[in-house]
Amino acid sequence: MNIQTDAIQVSFGSKTILHDISLAIQDKEFVGIIGPNGSGKSTFLKCLYRVLQPSGGKIYFDGSELSSLSHRDTALKMAVVAQHSTVNFDFSVLEMVLMGRSPYKGLLDRDKIDDYEIARHALEQVGLSDFESRNFNTLSGGEQQRVILARALAQRTECLVLDEPTNHLDIKYQLELMTIVKRLDATVVSAIHDLNLAAIYCDRIIALKDGYIVCSGTPQEVLTAETIRHIYGVSAMVQTLPDGRLNIIYNME
């Protein structure tokens, strides 16, 4: 799925959070959004998945203006892994993942055999097949995050939006989650806190600071020592490994 944003602006009162964000994301491209806290990463993603209405500008999915789509049509096109997922009811893990099938059903429709097969396959993908009967609220933060990813995978959409998806995960599961997402036959837009993960998995990186796009390009183009200092205010050494990947080492000053 292609995504285009045209001069997106978000303001709360007199404070502007995003300034004229215009970009084009190509079908099946993995785009990482980086920047310090308060740079506008989550705000931009919330505009994509319709939690926030931009103060100005337009968003297009495959040429159709996002505001013209029903929420059901949006859910058939895009799944979301948000930063915080609060559940006030005692749902099982399998019930949580089955919620990803909701866009395909009527309000009173029951889950079908295919829905259960898709949900269980998603749990297998994230390594939680043995957890399906567990209460979601009893899981650790990292386990809950993997369940939320499984729910998004069960949605079977053309686009996946993730807001710092590796929060609460140890290194093994960070790599496993990002590898799963990278292998999807889908467009991926993800806010990423860890620049080394962004360097490994992203086709393109968009860097934000104070609500503005600072630069956009391949990891090699964006993740330079100069850009990291400008955006984050820290000194870093950027190494190119023999396989062409980047390794970022931060310096104490």
Question: Language-model features: where?
Answer:
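The feature captures the beta-strand-to-loop junction immediately N-terminal to the Walker
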Residues: 34-36
